Amino acid sequence: AAAAGGAIGVLTDALPRDGEGEGSGFGVCGPDVIVVRDSLVALQRLASWNRQQSAALCVGVTGSVGKTTTRQMIHAVLGEQWSVLQSPANYNNEIGVPLTLLELGPAHGAAVLELGAGRVGDIRFLCGLAHPEWGVITRVSACHLESFGDLSAVQATKQELVEAIPGSGCVFLNADQAEVCAMSRATSARVVYFGYQAEGSGRCALRGVEGGRIRFCS
């Protein structure tokens, strides 16, 4: 399928057995084939290497809700100054984040990545690939409790992004939720609060809807 779709290379941990590859495009004139022990691990390592070749600012966005909208807004703002890569759709897991990072090139000045989680440790792992310098926490809520167990586990998992931000970086926290505000104790980076309760920081209020556009005032 990859060859038929025009792929010039294939990364795989399983070559087709004799007869199974007939008509697949593999062969002397087909795509280059790289065989590895684990194709997912290889994908992640390639993505991490590509990220380390880039000087682009990396912004990680996580939270139980609002990741996509927040990512799109950050992309729009940073796009005023740089060429910005962003996660396509909801590419926010152990496959989607590496695929996004592989798109990072010399022309990009920044990257905005959604970081999702299905269990404790997922965000920490993704940060190990992406090395974000800025982190944004939207909100913590009782989502996916079938895998997390309780709200404290969700909070701890989202906090993994805060813990990954270097001291020279910046963390943006939702001032309207105590569970998110408490994450400030987990970082030595600069902390910027946003929300209705964010006095002296990033406070904004809905001004209204005009012609299909939402207007805010800060």
Language-model-detected regions and their locations in the chain:
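Phosphate-binding loop of NTP-binding sites
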Residues: 40-175, 181-187
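Acidic, Mg2+-coordinating active-site environments of NTP-dependent enzymes
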Residues: 3, 12, 16-30, 136-218
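Residues at the C-termini of beta-strands that transition into short coil/loop
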Residues: 37, 88, 194-197
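General small-molecule cofactor/ligand-binding pocket signal
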Residues: 34, 85, 192
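Generic structural signal for well-ordered secondary structure
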Residues: 3-4, 39
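N-terminal pre-Walker A segment at the start of P-loop NTPase domains
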Residues: 31-41
